[in-house]
């Protein structure tokens, strides 16, 4: 079986993904955090060529296209990319994007020039060989270029499940008895990811926690009713320890050396 067949494809459930992820407070907060990080990134201060690996429905890619960047979106799911293209037309940026239904493992075959900036968000945790994927990202970015990598944090998943009282699940080392279609099956230990990045030829220039507080609220209704204050707190503290390390996701800015 090929790697492309093994890795997760969201064809057939793109609409469910949009409703349950992108349109929720989780998705809104993630978008705001990433856009804040990018607004402070000198690599994106002027229009650039960007590759978005596992772009999904393109929420972040299209926001960058609106800032003047040329963005190539790739994803295993054609359904996701079709939604991205439709949204791009509505925003008037369809001439600034290209969409390709390709797995990460196929991108080296395209003979594209290396990109100054590569994004790979919430992808590694769906792959069977995440360490190999980081090496493949290094091959796609220019030396001296930037990779924005966001991954699902196993430490944070463990912490949240302890808080919820899911002790048996934690004692099974977060092994699912029944798989949940939109829940990543392979959360990653941050120390492993840091090591893989170094071995692949990257230096970590920045680290941000994503959803450092959102998932831990005692009153979950406040995720919606107090969203503005929650976001303000997130943006103020999500680069400081220990909070950065308990974000449900970690966002790393990697410099290719």
Predicted regions and their residues:
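A short glycine-rich, Lys/Arg-flanked "PGG" loop and its adjoining helix->strand segment in the class I
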Residues: 131-146
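A C-terminal cap/extension of S-adenosyl-L-methionine-dependent methyltransferases
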Residues: 206-257
């Amino acid at each position: 079986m090929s790697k492309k067949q093994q890795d997760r494809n969201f064809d057939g459930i793109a609409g469910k993904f949009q409703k349950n992820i992108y349109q929720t407070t989780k998705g809104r907060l993630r978008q705001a955090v990433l856009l804040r990080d990018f607004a402070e990134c000198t690599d994106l201060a002027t229009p650039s060529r960007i590759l978005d690996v596992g772009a999904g429905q393109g929420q972040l890619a299209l926001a960058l296209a609106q800032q003047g960047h040329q963005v190539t979106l790739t994803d295993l799911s054609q359904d996701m990319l079709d939604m991205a293209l439709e949204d791009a037309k509505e925003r008037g940026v369809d001439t600034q994007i290209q969409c390709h239904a390709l797995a990460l493992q196929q991108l080296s075959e395209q003979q594209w020039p290396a990109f100054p900036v590569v994004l790979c968000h919430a992808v590694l945790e769906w792959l069977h060989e995440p360490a190999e994927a980081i090496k493949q990202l290094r091959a796609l970015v220019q030396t001296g270029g930037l990779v924005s990598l966001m991954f699902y944090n196993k430490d944070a998943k463990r912490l949240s499940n302890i808080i919820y009282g899911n002790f048996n699940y934690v004692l099974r080392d977060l092994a699912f008895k029944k798989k949940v279609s939109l829940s990543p099956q392979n959360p990653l230990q941050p120390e492993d990811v840091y090591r893989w990045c170094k071995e692949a030829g990257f230096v970590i220039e920045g680290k941000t926690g994503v959803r450092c507080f959102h998932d831990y609220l005692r009153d979950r209704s406040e995720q919606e009713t107090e969203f503005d204050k929650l976001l303000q707190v997130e943006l103020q503290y999500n680069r400081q320890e220990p909070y950065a390390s308990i974000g449900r996701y970690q966002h790393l800015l990697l410099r290719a050396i």
